[in-house]
Regions:
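Conserved phosphate-binding catalytic cores of ATP/NTP-utilizing and phosphoryl-transfer enzymes
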Residues: 1-2, 71-97, 102, 106-115, ...
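Short glycine-rich, Thr/Ser-proximal phosphate-binding strand/loop in the N-terminal lobe
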Residues: 2-40, 114
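Short glycine-aspartate micro-motif
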Residues: 6-10, 52-55, 94-98, 119, ...
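Conserved phosphate-binding/catalytic loops in two-lobed NTP-binding clefts
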Residues: 72-78, 236-259
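Active-site rim beta-loop-alpha module in soluble metabolic enzymes
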Residues: 132-210
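Short beta-strand-loop/turn "lid" adjacent to the catalytic site in phosphate-handling enzymes
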Residues: 28-34, 43-77, 87-89, 108-116
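Glycine-rich phosphate-binding loops at beta-strand->alpha-helix junctions
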Residues: 15, 55-63, 209-212, 216-238, ...
Length: 275
């Protein structure tokens, strides 16, 4: 493919992500809530003069053939996830956990087709839904701020609550059961931290099992939730217990959008793209 400037579009369930690729690098990004997205939202980035649009995601069917005179490439979502994660992380081979509304696990290696290994309904949507039901504010940054102040000991049952003996490989803070200690004394901050921890442990442990099966240690985390400091803090507790390395690349929320463009620029993969 001759194009060197592409606009990648990830039509997600919760949000639409845009990434402008030029000279092999992401130079601009934008995000629009899915419920508010209009095709006219592309106009600002289209002024940069991309030669084509690479679109992926659940809502990619909104683009058909050409748009504003530009060719539209339909890129398989798992291919976009793999290409974006590897390009932004600089890794040659890795398991990718795409944490969006739910979570998808993809095995990616340069020069090989991406493979979808499976997924989970637990993700960012779970976190927002739980917080709204608990009477909290379903806003990622506010949830993160609350969770940073919370105390897991007020909500989760840990090994240290059950025994004072040392258990090899399982330190006292290891969770036995999420929310099993939840009582009336737990604050909204404690609930927020417990909810984030539930998502982190589910994503983290599923990644551990998938990484073992694929015989890989590097796990790239992409999506908006993974950029929250409290998410990174809690998921790295999984890393301390298991032989995996979690990576959060720059522009992680836009990895799939960028990946659509990176994938479309790969000549050997053009046969997988719907024109």
């Amino acid at each position: 493919m001759a194009e060197q400037r592409l606009l990648g579009v990830d039509m997600g369930v919760s949000a639409v992500k845009l990434a402008l690729l030029e000279g092999g690098a992401v130079v601009r990004t934008a995000r629009v809530e899915a419920g508010r997205f209009q095709l006219s939202d592309l106009d600002e980035l289209l002024q940069a003069g991309p030669e084509a649009i690479a679109v992926t995601g659940m809502g990619a069917s909104r683009f058909d053939g050409a748009f504003r005179g530009l060719p539209v490439r339909q890129v398989p979502e798992f291919s976009a996830i793999g290409a974006g994660a590897l390009a932004l992380s600089g890794l040659e081979r890795a398991l990718v956990a795409s944490v969006g509304t739910g979570t998808a696990f993809v095995m990616a290696a340069r020069g090989e087709p991406a493979r979808h290994l499976g997924g989970s309904g637990v993700g960012g949507g779970t976190l927002m839904g739980l917080m709204q039901r608990m009477g909290g504010e379903p806003d990622a940054e506010r949830v993160a701020a609350c969770a940073a102040r919370g105390d897991l000991r007020a909500v989760d049952l840990c090994i240290g609550d059950l025994t004072d003996r040392d258990i090899p490989g399982l330190p006292p803070y290891t969770t036995v059961s999420n929310f099993a200690r939840l009582g009336r004394e737990a604050s909204s901050d404690d609930l927020a931290r417990g909810a984030v921890n539930l998502v982190c442990q589910t994503v983290g442990m599923m990644a551990v099992f998938a990484a073992r099966a694929e015989r890989v240690q590097d796990v790239v985390l992409i999506g908006t939730p993974v950029t929250l400091p409290v998410f990174q803090e809690l998921i790295h507790m999984v890393e301390w217990l298991h032989p995996v390395r979690f990576h959060v690349p720059p522009l992680a929320p836009f990895a799939t959008a960028a990946g659509a463009a990176f994938f479309a620029l790969s000549p050997e993969r053009e046969s997988d793209i719907v024109q």
